[in-house]
Amino acid sequence: MTYRCLLQMVLLLCFSTTALSRSYSLLRFQQRQSLKECQKLLGQLPSTSQHCLEARMDFQMPEEMKQEQQFQKEDAILVMYEVLQHIFGILTRDFSSTGWSETIIEDLLKELYWQMNRLQPIQKEIMQKQNSTTEDTIVPHLGKYYFNLMQYLESKEYDRCAWTVVQVQILTNVSFLMRLTGYVRD
């Protein structure tokens, strides 16, 4: 009897995860809620004075992030996943010079990780189909953009001003992700 219940629970979990990943409306809602939480957490991080923003540079943000563009649902998911991975990677660097709360950063990383976990099964399926155009266009541009952000942090030795500049970039990225969630529909 116990094994039958256990088997039913395992099957239910497997099918519910698959079913949930297919409900794009639910995914869109959950992503938006999580992104709002990310914005709130980023806003709680103290930023330094305005003079730090004078130290910013052109990180060569892809045009697709700067201006409104139409995305297919699949392309939006691939781009969202890529952006989330890069933001996660940046926030795992040495931010000790910033005075930022480790708790806030941990909560932010949890939100980002949760979002990536929700997108990953769909992202893998899309990648297997290989009919997406984003691999040839925006994804390499994203890689270069985030590489430039990382190089900037390293060249500034992760100082407080550099992190302020990157914080502004990440807030812009989260706004871009919010726009992208609009393309994730059933």
From Swiss-Prot:
Principal subcellular localisation of the protein:
secreted
Which keywords does this Swiss-Prot/TrEMBL entry list?
Antiviral defense, Cytokine, Disulfide bond, Glycoprotein, Secreted, Signal
The UniProt GO MF terms for this protein read: cytokine activity; type I interferon receptor binding
Q: Does the keyword Flavoprotein apply?
A: no
Q: Which GO terms describe its cellular component?
A: extracellular space
**Signal peptide region:** 1-21
Instruction: Write down a Pfam family by its short name.
Output: Interferon
A Gene Ontology biological process in which this protein takes part is:
negative regulation of Lewy body formation
Please report any disulfide bonds recorded for this protein chain, giving both cysteine positions.
C52-C161
Q: Which SUPFAM superfamilies match?
A: 4-helical cytokines (SSF47266)
Which cellular compartments is it found in? Secreted
Q: Does the keyword Nucleus apply?
A: no
Q: Which SMART domains match?
A: IFabd
Q: List glycan-bearing residues.
A: N131, N173
InterPro entries the UniProt entry points to: 4_helix_cytokine-like_core (IPR009079), Interferon_alpha/beta/delta (IPR000471)
- PANTHER family given in the database record: INTERFERON BETA, TYPE I INTERFERON
Under the subunit heading, UniProt states:
Monomer.
Protein family (similarity comment) = Belongs to the alpha/beta interferon family.
- Its biological purpose: Type I interferon cytokine that plays a key role in the innate immune response to infection, developing tumors and other inflammatory stimuli. Signals via binding to high-affinity (IFNAR2) and low-affinity (IFNAR1) heterodimeric receptor, activating the canonical Jak-STAT signaling pathway resulting in transcriptional activation or repression of interferon-regulated genes that encode the effectors of the interferon response, such as antiviral proteins, regulators of cell proliferation and differentiation, and immunoregulatory proteins.
Listed name of the protein? Interferon beta
